[in-house]
Amino acid sequence: AQTSSINAFSPYTMYGIGEQNTPGTLPMRSMGGVGVAMRSSGVVNLLNPAAFSAAPQKSFLFNFGLEGQNYYNSQKVDGMSKSTAYNTFNFHDIAFQLPLAKKLGLGFSLTPYSSVGYRTKYTHDYDPSDPVWGNVGRAQYVYQGEGDVTEVKLGVGWELFKNFSLGIAAQYYWGDIDRSFVMTPTPITGDGSYSSTVGTDNYSISSIKGQIGVQWNAILNQKRALTLGAAYDFGGDLNPT
């Protein structure tokens, strides 16, 4: 078993910016990342800036989240049972929300947006009938990578009129992702000399986007409550360089 501070350990993070984290604070993550319409004076809503207008006067909401995961895999290879375990532990979100004026609130959050973490190994066995590998022998391929993308958001929410709120936020994304590939040949016949092939990719991400959101309390009384919400991100894709 291994332990790491990265937030992912999956071969699927070999592509793009990796595995996207479930957004939101604990109440929203426990519902699978939904909560655009959630409006509460006691919960920081990171999914919709319009919810910042729900901050009660003379209050300060602070949220700090931690996340830990355990990955375990067991399989049979060539009749032999092999297993691996990996533990991850890191912070998930730091956020706060406070009122600026009556029906006007401000929110801030710092959250991991996506994570990359993998190491896979593949061996191409010796095949004497192959015209190429019959001379080279066995070759081992190792692919590995790690990194993450972090999101910081600052927004305001304003209740324009009764039961209808509008919010806008600025989002900044940054991070580094490193990937490498190594091919190591092992001659079987002892003839010839072969060197390893190494390839590396280093990506840096720095991008600014925006978000606009609305919330409407369609029904709000002592017996029932129905809130409709929507949020839209604008500003393009996260393109690594």
Task: Place the predicted regions along the sequence by residue.
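Outer-membrane beta-barrel translocator/receptor signature
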Residues: L26, M38-K121
